[in-house]
Amino acid sequence: STHCISSAASDVYKRQAEWDHAARFFWNTVVNHRSVCIGGNSVREHFHPSDNFTSMLNDVQGAETCNTYNMLRLTKMLYQNSGDVDNSNKPDPRYVDYYERALYNHILSSQEPDKGGFVYFTPMRPGHYRVYSQPETSMWCCVGSGLENHTKYGEFIYAHQQDTLYVNLFIPSQLNWKEQGVTLTQETLFPDDEKVTLRIDKAAKKNLTLMIRIPEWAGNSKGYEITINGKKHLSDIQTGASTYLPIRRKWKKGDMITFHLPMKVSLEQIPDKKDYYAFLYGPIVLATSTGTENLDGIYADDSRGGHIAHGRQTPLQEIPMLIGNPDSIRHSLHKLSGSKLAFSYDGNVYPTQKSKSLELIPFFRLHNSRYAVYFRQASEEQFKTIQEEMATAEQKATDLANRTVDLVFPGEQQPESDHGILYEASETGTHKDRHFRRAKGWFSYNLKVKEEASQLMITVRQEDRNLSLIHISEPTRLGMI
């Protein structure tokens, strides 16, 4: 399939320049400052501070699929009008870089391949897992958008503009470009194989330009080694930024364009520059399985919060920590032979793995398992101190989690809705990067209870500590605070 770059949607942007500026500012902020390696964003459906991704690494309610669904819709619209913004009359391939990253690593990973269930939250907490919807129990927002997500893998592969065809994504496909009388077939096993072949099955007798995308992760055009009908195509494009390589000629039936994508292993630090890193191969995020135990509720029931992975949270000190500097860590990951992507890490790892090395595969292929996408990195000198600090913090967090019957985050829409919020003359806001609800009148929640529950823990401002704040309704009265 293909789109025309001048669309009704982009016409709206042309008429509303201030909207266009706001949309691009939002896109740049989310993509470059608030997104993790899979292209997703947010914790508990809210943006955390852009300079602190701690909650993303700790919380089990990680990147929401609907957010990425909408970011891809916005990306497509901005791409279609991007040439008008800088007066280049050419679309900006940086939008395709993000689209590709989010498509392969978040969207493709959000459907369970056996039963077809959809994912609501994708935790980035190392050692946790995802929950999958079921037809009779789960009609979440991420099921509705999920039904759309997996029908749209073909919509962004190509774009056209007058007599120019843009090849954006490397996905097996056939294009019928009716306006120019061209039929083209793309053959590839990407990302398992670097080879891409474009075959002209039908062509009109006129000059047309083929624009082949050179992604940012490819480095420069030298690695492409483009051949046309077996003869090397020379190009003087040298860039580390995303761009297009133009080939203009009078195409004929049977013409074959072949190139190899220069994919390599890279190490990407979490955006707030904590010592957590993810491995990528080209644009593909890699992950390791950390076990299949205690996957409580992996297939969602119809309970409140059935979309959340409520099972045991693996203590972070039990997750593989990579010992060494980032450069040595990157060079310790090696591609294995075989038809499917797989990698072996032979560097220094703590805790020591049962097998001799750590095995990683594309995240989108890792299902029905706990996993780690981000890994803690430490030098030899930092290692012992970090272990002690993590063990102390994790013990406190684990003790609290094991004692917790229910949990609500005041001022956050979905947690409050899930807990039956009622209020009168109440307002919400944020203070020091935390959401709050203020009771000028009153507000209430419905909380789960257990007979053995004996405490209610709340967070209040220091100046409010001595006020009479909480009433617990009968028949379960824990006391007055």
What are these regions (language model features)?
Residues S1, S7-S10, G40-E64, K115-M139:
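Carbohydrate-binding/catalytic loop surfaces
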Residues T2-A9, Y13, I470-H471, L478-I481:
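Single conserved hydrophobic/aromatic residue that forms the stacking wall/gate
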Residues C4-Q16, S55-D59, N70-N87, T197-K202:
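Well-ordered alpha-helical scaffold segments within catalytic/enzyme domains
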Residues A23, D97-N105, S110, D114-R199, ...:
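C-terminal beta-rich recognition modules with glycine/proline-rich loops and embedded aromatic residues
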Residues L198-K206, R437-A439, F443-S454:
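Extracellular and analogous surface-interaction loops
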Residues T209-E216, E451-N466:
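A short beta-strand element within beta-rich, extracytoplasmic domains
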Residues S221-G230, L467-R477:
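Short, surface-exposed beta-strand/strand-loop-strand elements in extracellular ectodomains
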Residues E225-M256, M263-P271:
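A surface-exposed beta-strand-loop module
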